[in-house]
Amino acid sequence: MKIVLATSNLDKVKEIKEFLKGYEIYALSEVVKPFEIVEDGSTFQANALIKSRAVFAKLKELGLEDEFVSLSDDSGISVDALGGEPGIYSARYFDLDENGKVCGKNANDANNRAKLISKLKALNLKSSPAHYTACIAISSKFGDYTAHGFMYGEAIDEERGTNGFGYDALFIPNGFNKTLGELDNETKLKISHRSKGLELANFVLKSLKKNFS
């Protein structure tokens, strides 16, 4: 059984490969031609399933459903003081207008972080309770499966550290005085929302692996 990841995010690919050792794992571009997936779900779970199902459909078109499963991750940060923003729009936060609609495709890690900082500062806050959510979805010839992982802490109004991506430099996990951007990879791998979700998803993968010839 081989796994193709339903993402073009190289940072996510690296992190997932580090956790799921012992599997033959491929980035999306290594198996199928890149194609656009419209993530129009209202939850992390819905969007994760949209991605894993879309990729598995491509695998079926190529006659690879007996060889591969698809695995996707949909994750994001929710800040209490911002009413749960950016949430499922974490990767597209800069492009999110005041009416909750995504306009344009200009969002990147840097301007997403800058927007979150400006939102906190507008409320005269230096920090707010926040949490990360990760939903891992697996699609296979046997069906679809999901698992969730969470990490709690606080979002702050200044960037600290350069080790990581996304909002890592703005998030201090509970029990630590450093941001994810300041922590080493080994520590992050132990506590991250994605790792917790992958730990549960690994039970599914082990079970599926037994059913592949």
UniProtKB/Swiss-Prot annotation:
Pfam families: Ham1p_like (PF01725). One of its GO terms (cellular component) is cytosol. Mg(2+) binds at residue 74. One of its GO terms (biological process) is purine nucleoside triphosphate catabolic process. Its EC number is 3.6.1.66. Its cofactor is Mg(2+). The keyword Endoplasmic reticulum does not apply. Substrate binds at residues 7-12, 75, 165-168, 188, 193-194. It comes from the Bacteria. It catalyses: XTP + H2O = XMP + diphosphate + H(+); dITP + H2O = dIMP + diphosphate + H(+); ITP + H2O = IMP + diphosphate + H(+). Gene3D superfamilies: 3.90.950.10. Keywords: Hydrolase, Magnesium, Metal-binding, Nucleotide metabolism, Nucleotide-binding. One of its GO terms (molecular function) is ITP diphosphatase activity. Binds 1 Mg(2+) ion per subunit. The active site is at residue 74. InterPro entries: dITP/XTP_pyrophosphatase (IPR020922), ITPase-like_fam (IPR029001), RdgB/HAM1 (IPR002637). Belongs to the HAM1 NTPase family. Pyrophosphatase that catalyzes the hydrolysis of nucleoside triphosphates to their monophosphate derivatives, with a high preference for the non-canonical purine nucleotides XTP (xanthosine triphosphate), dITP (deoxyinosine triphosphate) and ITP. Seems to function as a house-cleaning enzyme that removes non-canonical purine nucleotides from the nucleotide pool, thus preventing their incorporation into DNA/RNA and avoiding chromosomal lesions. PANTHER family: INOSINE TRIPHOSPHATE PYROPHOSPHATASE, INOSINE TRIPHOSPHATE PYROPHOSPHATASE/HAM1 PROTEIN. Homodimer. This is dITP/XTP pyrophosphatase. It comes from Campylobacter concisus (strain 13826).
